[in-house]
Design a protein with these regions (language model features):
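C-terminal motif of bacterial Sec signal peptides marking the signal peptidase cleavage site
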Residues: 13-15
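Residue-level signal for mature regions of secreted extracellular proteins and peptides
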Residues: 9-10
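A short, Gly/Thr-enriched small/hydrophobic beta-strand-prone motif that recurs across taxa
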Residues: 22-48, 178-192
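Tryptophan-paired
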Residues: 46, 50-127, 183-187, 191-312, ...
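Short, polar/proline-rich extracytoplasmic segments that appear immediately after membrane translocation
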Residues: 22-27, 304-351
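Bacterial N-terminal signal peptides that target proteins for export
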Residues: 1-5
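Structured interaction patches on ligand/partner-binding surfaces of diverse proteins
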Residues: 86-87, 119-171, 290-315
């Protein structure tokens, strides 16, 4: 998703209409007109292959947006709240407003926040950078829900930031906007090795739980220098969805889960995001009979792209491959997908 703002100088409009959000200032002809275009590809809702890292329509839907501009001292010089109608129509009808008191060669910091309110008392860049996102739980829910709609009211929060020097003529500002959360898809299946060992026996995954996730993250990406100092106590559990597509036996079933989590810095083994699979082993592969079932648990960690690092707007596919029943033997291969780029992690579980 791209957001483009174009500043045109000198001023082309003599005055603003009385209902304009930001009145035209009188400051010696240093005003600039901003022409804002929000670009967001429109795709129809539909079924897709699980684990492809595709960005769904509800994951990039825009309901509201705000543009905030700061001068070099970090003081807010413009805030423009955009309505849903303005945002959705901006590709054909650019949004125009005034950037006051800016001379050529001056540098300005541009920030865009989508699908989230910014309090009126946040009037400096420093205060905006202190803002935290703390509602990660609201993104998660049942598999049926998270794979068909945005669970968070208002949609996925997205932000972008860039610095631009104002030119004497037209200043074009291009900004990349990213979701503040990461996406994790987990698919569990039994391997040929499992079927060789246990014949018709199968494992039915009941629930998958992620834990040790970051409770909060900064609203504005600052990961080049720091992460929000928060606890790693976020936990989310979800019943597994059984995918029987193309399966002739229960030991060929696949089990799917999807979570959204906050960014998290790379960490040593034992401190990364933990994945727990709660399942039952069925000796004869007939899941309708329970006398031959045994509870089993598998544990592993998310490797992220590398070292357990989870990036905002990152997409991670975990292939959990069950080789046995002990839950001790774990091998992971992660694919990082875009959203930014799909990262896949394969993990072999059991012996």
């Amino acid at each position: 998703m791209k957001l483009t703002a174009i500043a045109v100088m000198p001023m082309l409009l003599a005055a603003c209409t009385k209902d304009e959000v930001n009145p035209t200032p009188t400051n010696g002809g240093k005003e600039g007109e901003i022409e804002l275009i929000l670009k967001n590809e429109s795709v129809a809702d539909g079924t897709r292959a699980f684990g492809s890292g595709t960005t769904e329509s509800w994951e990039k839907s825009i309901s509201s947006a705000v543009l905030i501009v700061y001068n070099t001292s970090g003081t807010q010089i413009l805030r423009r709240v955009l309505t849903a109608a303005e945002v959705n129509g901006s590709t054909t009808t650019p949004i125009k407003f005034v950037l006051p008191g800016v001379s050529a060669d001056a540098s300005c910091d541009f920030y865009v926040v989508i699908n989230r309110n910014i309090a009126d008392n946040i009037t400096t860049k420093a205060k905006l950078l202190e803002e935290l996102e703390s509602d990660i739980a609201s993104y998660n829910g049942t598999y049926a829900n998270v794979t068909t709609k945005a669970m968070r009211s208002g949609g996925f929060v997205m932000t972008g930031a860039t610095t631009a020097k104002i030119a004497a003529g037209t200043t074009a500002v291009t900004m990349t906007v990213k979701r503040v959360v990461a996406k994790v898809e987990i698919q569990t299946s039994m391997t040929d090795s499992f079927r060789t060992k246990y014949g018709n026996g199968c494992v039915e995954v009941k629930k998958v739980t992620l834990s040790r996730g970051a409770e909060k993250s900064f609203l504005i990406d600052q990961t080049t220098s720091k992460y929000a100092t928060v606890s790693s106590s976020f936990t989310s559990a979800q019943d597994a969805y059984c995918d029987k597509t193309g399966a002739s036996k229960t030991n060929a079933y696949k089990y799917n889960n999807l979570f959204y989590i906050n960014e998290k810095a790379a960490a040593a083994t034992g401190s990364r995001i933990k994945v727990v699979l709660n399942a039952v082993y069925d000796a004869d592969g007939n899941l309708s009979t329970t006398t031959d079932q045994l509870a089993v648990t598998y544990e592993t960690e998310l490797t992220g792209a590398t070292g357990g690092k989870i990036a905002r707007n990152g997409s991670y596919k975990v292939n959990a491959k069950l080789d046995g029943l002990t839950g001790q033997d774990v091998t992971l291969a992660v694919t990082v997908a875009n959203w930014d780029a799909l990262s896949t992690q394969d993990v072999n579980l059991g012996q």
